[in-house]
């Protein structure tokens, strides 16, 4: 299922790259980075807290969901009202007509919490099916709209449908469904766990997105589109890695001692290395043909960044499991 999800997502991006012009991807990259700041702030580590909590109750899930949903809705409104000012500061006023739908995306992302309940219970099949159906729905919508000439809106609406459908199915599959209830005494340990993680998430956001903001501000949407696609395709191997982490992290969280945890860390790193190095070698050797015949001639300016990002993605995939170890220790 993991491979199928990545294949469908990558295949959709490949089709969209052939149907749309690079500037559409540049607009998406800039806006998803700007709006993503609000989305990251709304994620206070509730999902990770649920996975690592040894004696999770319905009230715990209710408290986490209620708090993060309220924060998410508030930040979605903040983006809706403040996007014009933010884009003006960044001198990207031309993107304002595309900004409003991202407020819906910010809010919908807060409905993903039952996925972490499924993963805590090691029900990865249900979690993966929900994620796959979200990817499939978003892909179908995006390609359909692109064929109808909707341009960048095909990418934005596809993103929203992906979040919506995934949320619907994780709620369907989860036996424990969070409710709108809040208990302050249960929020205290959650906040102690989540706030440091939220601060870390902001640094992660900066790490992954500041380059899009810089490229988009000082270059044009087309050049940012080249950069985005060059970055996007190599990092499908990191999508595989993140899905591996959905298995590795709960397993690490269940270890009884540091020795067992270290054995798991070494084994996970070993297999991640084998998975990462093969595409790296292939892209270095055959990158020109992959871009020309896969994406199309219009994407040839993305070749060198594509090769560089593939190597960087491989290195990151090999070294990422320290983060799972850190979280598993609470």
Language-model segments: which ranges?
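Membrane-water interface segments that mark the loop-to-transmembrane alpha-helix transition
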Residues: 1-9, 31, 36, 40-84, ...
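Specific pore-lining/lateral-gate transmembrane helices of multi-pass inner-membrane transport
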Residues: 52-67, 226-330
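Alpha-helical transmembrane segments of multi-pass membrane proteins
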Residues: 37-38, 77, 81, 91-114, ...
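Membrane-interface junctions at transmembrane-helix termini in multi-pass inner-membrane proteins
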Residues: 48-58, 107-131, 153, 174, ...
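Hydrophobic alpha-helical transmembrane segments
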Residues: 95-103, 128-175, 192-194, 200, ...
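Helix-terminus/linker motif at the lipid-water interface of multi-pass membrane proteins
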Residues: 10-24, 87-88, 144-146, 205-236, ...
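Interhelical loop/hinge segments that connect adjacent transmembrane helices in multipass membrane
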Residues: 125, 129, 168-209, 213, ...
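Signature of the first transmembrane helix
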Residues: 1-44, 71-83, 134-143, 158-163, ...
């Amino acid at each position: 299922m993991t491979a199928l999800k990545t294949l469908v997502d990558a295949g959709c991006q490949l089709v969209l790259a052939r149907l749309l012009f690079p500037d559409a991807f540049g607009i998406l990259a800039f806006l998803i980075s700007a709006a993503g700041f609000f989305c990251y702030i709304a994620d206070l580590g509730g999902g990770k807290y649920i996975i690592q909590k040894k004696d999770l109750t319905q009230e715990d899930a209710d408290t986490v969901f209620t708090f993060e949903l309220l924060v998410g809705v508030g930040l979605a409104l903040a983006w809706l009202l403040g996007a014009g000012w933010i884009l003006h500061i960044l001198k990207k006023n031309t993107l304002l007509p595309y900004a409003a739908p991202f407020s819906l995306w910010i809010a919908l992302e807060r409905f993903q919490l039952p996925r972490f309940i499924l993963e805590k219970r090691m029900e990865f099949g249900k979690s993966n099916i929900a994620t796959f159906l979200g990817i499939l729905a978003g892909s179908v919508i995006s390609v359909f709209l692109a064929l109808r000439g909707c341009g960048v809106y095909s990418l934005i609406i596809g993103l929203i449908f992906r979040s919506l459908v995934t949320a619907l199915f994780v709620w369907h599959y989860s036996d424990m469904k969070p409710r709108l209830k809040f208990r302050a005494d249960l929020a205290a340990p959650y906040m102690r766990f989540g706030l440091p993680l939220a601060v870390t998430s902001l640094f992660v956001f900066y790490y992954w997105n500041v380059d899009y903001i810089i490229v988009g501000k000082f270059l044009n949407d087309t050049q940012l589109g080249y950069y985005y696609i060059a970055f996007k395709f190599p990092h499908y191997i990191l999508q595989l890695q993140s899905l591996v982490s959905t298995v590795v992290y709960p397993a690490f969280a269940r270890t009884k001692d540091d020795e067992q945890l270290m054995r798991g860390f070494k084994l996970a790193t070993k297999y991640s290395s084998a998975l990462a190095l093969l595409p790296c070698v292939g892209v270095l050797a055959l990158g020109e043909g992959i871009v020309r015949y896969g994406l199309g001639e219009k994407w040839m300016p993305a070749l060198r960044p594509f090769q560089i990002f593939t190597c960087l993605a491989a290195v990151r995939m090999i070294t990422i499991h320290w983060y799972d170890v850190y979280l598993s220790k609470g």
